[in-house]
Regions:
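Polyanionic, low-complexity intrinsically disordered segments
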Residues: 18, 23-25, 143-148, 152-156
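C-terminal edge-of-domain segments
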Residues: 155-171
Length: 171
């Protein structure tokens, strides 16, 4: 099983003994990590080798998510007001904004800079845009990022997901 929700990982691991076949849990934390792990599956490799390679692939993914605050809240001492744009890095709120485009580009830029400072390269950025965003909106984000990161392969996918304006995979 490729689990992408950290709240479900423990339950999935506890269910292993109940299965009527051999089951392994790959504890991914975000949708892009799960997708990348699945894409690295090799039908010719054994289970252990696949677990190693799929885990390695998932661990190389940074995830940016842009959504909105559904209510007033306080996260880590930061006041968040209902309706504000939220920037999440690997599931954690790292900023707020009033403009979706600005929040998205700034978030990706910060993640790319952090990856480069820590020795992780950036070869691919995949922009998955949600039901509230048009293809033209996503193209503007892509174009802004392409202007900053020449040589990085940037693709767009209409994910149609609710709640998140953008889910972005950076690897």
């Amino acid at each position: 099983m490729c689990i992408r929700d950290r709240n479900i990982i423990l339950a999935a691991e506890q269910a292993i003994p109940l299965a009527d076949r051999k089951v392994h849990v790959l504890p991914t934390r975000t949708i892009p990590q799960g997708i990348t792990a699945m894409l690295s599956f090799d039908a010719d490799a054994d289970v252990e080798q696949n677990l190693i390679e799929m885990t390695k692939a998932a661990d190389n993914v940074s995830t940016a998510q842009v959504t909105f605050a559904a209510r007033n809240n306080n996260v880590g001492g930061q006041e968040i007001k209902e309706g504000q744009i939220l920037s999440l890095e690997n599931g954690k709120v790292v900023g707020t904004d009033t403009d979706i485009h600005h929040a998205t580009v700034k978030l990706v830029k910060n993640i790319v800079n952090t990856r480069r400072l820590t020795g992780k390269g950036v070869d691919f950025i995949t922009i998955i845009y949600g039901e509230g965003m048009s293809e033209a909106d996503a193209e503007q984000v892509r174009d802004s990022l392409q202007a900053k990161y020449d040589g990085v392969d940037i693709t767009m996918i209409n994910g149609g997901q609710p709640v998140y304006y953008y889910i972005i995979s950076i690897e």
